[in-house]
Every structure is written in structure tokens, then in C-alpha cells.
């Protein structure tokens, strides 16, 4: 009994830090401050003093990844604000109305489309489009938030441009096709779960989706013109990422995303000359932009404090004995995914341990099934994470209560995890 309690100690510490963060969010302390408080509590519980906490936080804010993410989110907000202010988002929705006649399809279409663009914080890109698609409907903000958040991530276990997939195949020394040939069920599972929990009749009543008469014309040229900035962002980012990976692998892929987003902003301003340079000055002085930046600061501080305090290593150390394989394939990926809120974190932190255990047990022939199980478990943790940047930014955009919105994710995430276990048992 005593040894069990000792093994649970690091997990209970992490749980306490999360409870503290959620309490701060609940009592309107603010997202950024709540996450910083959680990082400080975690630092103290894992042996870091206030000076070490500050040093870890300072290191986080000079990393390339932080600078790139801040630039990406900033450009996304500028682009979405420009399209909204110029009325282009509304015109785009009107031009697509003849193609997207189902209100439910309209709500999920743009998050799913933007999900093909593997960029951090991408849910804030599609959030204004969901808001525009929902105009005239009587849908609660938290419902729009979960629809945007969930359908933005339906491709992450299948789309080969996502960094989590790329890192997994690099660590396991396998081909991408060997992995996604078994992880692809994650996409239809998320589609079905998203429809059942967020979109089906009974969850969203038909009367809530009632709208005025939709245009019956289908103008491909109008849709192309109004959607050109999005095409520049998506196709440009994917193309530049591919070019960088093929010809300049030493250059961070985020630079391709930044260039594509900057070009899409230029595209909007050329198409809508009335915006002018005054628009840029106005958007850069908006409080909402800098609130988002502060949240990103807090998330990066939390991530680096977690690394500096050796949180993952401590959890892995106590998960030994007969529980090691289960812990490394399910529990640790889930927990690290939930703590960090990004795929690369659970892959990089726990997959080397999992691969090492499989090797030590002579189970290399079971590598793919266990990687699939760990991927489903880790991604479930990422999706349920209250500090997932897409979740936080989406809730911030729709101005909805984070706790109440988070509770709506428990059901579909449980279904997703159980489905992943089912896929694993099928493979073994």
C-alpha cells in the first residue's frame, strides 16, 4: 500500500496543479495568470524554487518555438480581423451557401478545412468563420467553441504533415504509411463522435439552426475570390512546409506557415483597399490580441517549468515493474498530453520509453499496435487538456466559461479513447 502511494505522489502533484489552474479560471483570475499559478505550484512541488521557476520561464520566452507561435497566432488574428472588418468572411459564407445547404455541415466545414493546415493555435483561425456560419442561429457560445475546437483536430492522427506523426515515425524508424495505415480510423471516429455529441438533432435542435432563405446559386468564381486569402494560407503553408522539408530541412517549418499567413494578409488588404494601413495600427492596439499573446507566454512558461522540474521523468521512474508497459503505452502518453496540450510533447517524452520497454521485452513485432494505442491515448489527453492552446484561444474568442465548455469534451474524448483501445485489440 505504501509503495502504491509513493508511486501516485507525482501524479497527485500534477493533478493538484491542474485543479489550481481550473480554480483560477473558474474564479475569473484570468487564463494566463491561472496557468502561471499552476506552473509555480508545480515548480515548488517538484523541487524548484522561485528563482529557478523564473529562470525556466525566461528561457521559455527566448525560444524560437515561442517566437514562431506568437507570430503565427498574431498573423491569424490580423487575417481573421481583416476578413471580418472588410465583410469578406460574410461574403465567403454567402458564396458557399449554395454548396453548404446543411446548417450542421456549415458549422463543421471551416474547422475541418483549417485542420488541414498544421499550425499551432489554428482553431482561432476558424473560430470567426464558425461565428459567421452561425449568424442567425440561436447557438450558445460554448457550443460554437466545442464545434470549432473538435472539428479543427479531426485530421491529426492521419494527415502526414502534422509534427506528431513525423516525430513518431522518426523515433520508431518506420515509414509514415506504416503508421497512418492504422491510425486513420481516428478521423472517422472523431467525425462520428463530434456529430453525436455536438451536432445531432436533440443536441442542436432544428429550431436553433433555423435561418433565413439561403442563396440557391453556386458561384465557383465568387467562392474562389472570397476564399483566396484562405487558399493562400493553406496551400501556401503546406507547399512551403513541403519545400522546406525537402530542400532546406534545417529551417523550421513554422517559417513557411508565417510567410503563407503574411501573404494571405497582404491578399486581403489588396482585395479590400479600404482597410488601409490604419487597420494594422488598430488591430495591433487591440486588447484581445495582447491577451492572446499573454496566454501563449503562460503556456510556454508552464511547458518549460514542467521540463525543468523533471515532471515526466519522475512519472516515468515510478511507473516500473509489471505496470511499465501499460503506463508507457496509455497512462503516461495520456497524462503528458493533458499536461502539455500538444502532440509533440507526449510523443517526444513517452515514446522513447515505450519503444525501450518493447525492446527489452522482446516485443518489437508489436511496435505498431502499441504505437497506435499510445497515439490514441496521448491525443485523448491533448484534446481533454485545459491548457491546449486551441481550446484556450477558442474559449477566449467566444468568451465562454472554460470549465463548462471543457465538460462537454469528456464524453467524446472517452469514446475516442475506447475506440483506440478497440483498434489496438484488433491489431494484436
What spans do the regions from the language model cover?
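Hydrophobic transmembrane alpha-helices of multi-pass small-molecule transporters
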Residues: 1-60, 66-68, 195-314, 425-428
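Membrane-interfacial loop-to-helix junctions in multi-pass transporters
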Residues: 7-12, 63-69, 95-108, 137-144, ...
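Short helix-coil transition sites and intra-membrane helix breaks within transmembrane domains
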Residues: 28-31, 67-69, 80-87, 115-128, ...
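Re-entrant/interfacial helical elements at transmembrane boundaries that shape
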Residues: 91, 122-134, 162-172, 345-359, ...
